[in-house]
Amino acid sequence: MDRRIFGLENEYGVTCTFRGQRRLSPDEVARYLFRRVVSWGRSSNVFLRNGARLYLDVGSHPEYATPECDNVVELVTHDKAGERILEGLLVDAEKRLREEGIAGDIYLFKNNTDSAGNSYGCHENYLVGRHGEFGRLADVLIPFLVTRQIVCGAGKVLQTPRGAVYCVSQRAEHIWEGVSSATTRSRPIINTRDEPHADAERFRRLHVIVGDSNMSETTMLLKVGATDLVLRMIEAGTVMRDLSLENPIRAIREVSHDMTGRRRVRLANGREASSLEIQQEYLSKARDFVDRRGGDEISHRVLELWERTLNAVETGNLDLVAREIDWVTKYQLIERYRKKYDLPLSSPRVAQLDLAYHDVHRRRGLFYLLQKRGAVERVASDLKIFEAKSVPPQTTRARLRGEFIRKAQEKRRDFTVDWVHLKLNDQAQRTVLCKDPFRSVDERVDKLIAGM
């Protein structure tokens, strides 16, 4: 697929610290956060003018699903716009708390685990053709996804019975099977529930739920960009070495616990390979593929960063990607802090630092303090991110949804939308079904808007 639809869903962790007598449960905090959303959307599950979906997921986790994007830079921009929208809700909720005499700070974390060991996710969505063999897609992808964390994990200090260890991935400890149709009870690597949110005869949505939520724009670009290249190779029939893993779930944990990328995991054919070797195999195939087929600026940037990250892991010279890869940026931050205060990795102060990296409040979050200092690389500009808070992507179906919502709100019309339906709740109950996510112009939608 030369042009692909991408989407990211990020669940956020919520917590509140109180200085007064009155304390709020996570549910109550989430209600404060979403009060403004409910006041204009009459629900805690809404679609926004930029085409995105914002809702309260199970366990009081706010979730932001980007609109459909057809290039990775735009996807990163819209994911960051989601952070800004949630930061706005947070500031608003804190103000409301103060007005009601409750002394407390609300924190929103874009991470994947809380202190109680619960996990919540970052789900990646890739549109693929219906005609391909989904089983083969999964077979080729799983070894890539299991080892991909070495280049795009978010990093985490994990407390184990043998002491604290630094892992490259947050999500790895919480994945229990390779391919499954459940997302919460048993967390698989690829979710197979068949909901294409598009014409089911033509398309299928590949739902990858193994990845970490990224603060770094460049890590996010690499995560989705490299996965897209691997998908394109599979779709083009590129012959790949069989790297199927004997036990993907054991392998994912082993890879996560090894910052050197050298620990060997067992393949289904009895041989062994390290995460570095497996990633290098996919990278060299992807490089050949782009050389043969030609690639755009984004794919060249992805390949360059992918290679440099593997080089950094292999040589142990993490400075090579300290400005671009989440787990490395965070690791170096923690190590500097530990040296300065002579702390063990198991120190509660280190755990606090680990968490503060993911705080989306720009005046408080450690990632944003690094960004303000110019210590991390960017993909999107602040202006583009600000625009993306209210303007949908212009080349996908999101444009139709965003325009419809904007007009209906301006005209104060009652409406219902989801990923494929646009409906005016008037006597005629006029509905337009948008089954092609690539289509950004549709006379039926224009007519629906004109008739408001």
UniProtKB/Swiss-Prot annotation:
Quick one: which pathway? Answer: Protein degradation; proteasomal Pup-dependent pathway; Protein modification; protein pupylation
Report the EC number(s), separated by commas if there are several.
Answer: 6.3.1.19
**Binding of Mg(2+), residues:** E9, Y55, E63
According to the record, the signal peptide region is none
Reactions catalysed, semicolon-separated, are: ATP + [prokaryotic ubiquitin-like protein]-L-glutamate + [protein]-L-lysine = ADP + phosphate + N(6)-([prokaryotic ubiquitin-like protein]-gamma-L-glutamyl)-[protein]-L-lysine
Annotated Gene Ontology MF terms? ATP binding; ligase activity, forming carbon-nitrogen bonds; magnesium ion binding; ubiquitin-like protein transferase activity
Instruction: Kindly indicate whether the keyword Nucleotide-binding belongs to this entry.
Output: yes
* Active site (record annotation): D57 (proton acceptor)
Q: Main EC class of this protein?
A: ligase
- Alphabetic keyword roster: ATP-binding, Ligase, Magnesium, Metal-binding, Nucleotide-binding, Ubl conjugation pathway
GO biological process: one example: modification-dependent protein catabolic process
Chain positions recorded as ATP binding sites: R53, T66, W419
User: What PANTHER family does its record include?
Assistant: PUP DEAMIDASE/DEPUPYLASE (PTHR42307), PUP--PROTEIN LIGASE (PTHR42307:SF3)
Miscellaneous: The reaction mechanism probably proceeds via the activation of Pup by phosphorylation of its C-terminal glutamate, which is then subject to nucleophilic attack by the substrate lysine, resulting in an isopeptide bond and the release of phosphate as a good leaving group.
Q: Which family does it belong to?
A: Belongs to the Pup ligase/Pup deamidase family. Pup-conjugating enzyme subfamily.
Please describe what this protein does: Catalyzes the covalent attachment of the prokaryotic ubiquitin-like protein modifier Pup to the proteasomal substrate proteins, thereby targeting them for proteasomal degradation. This tagging system is termed pupylation. The ligation reaction involves the side-chain carboxylate of the C-terminal glutamate of Pup and the side-chain amino group of a substrate lysine.
The protein here is known as Pup--protein ligase
Species whose genome carries this gene? Streptosporangium roseum (strain ATCC 12428 / DSM 43021 / JCM 3005 / KCTC 9067 / NCIMB 10171 / NRRL 2505 / NI 9100)
Gene name per UniProt: pafA
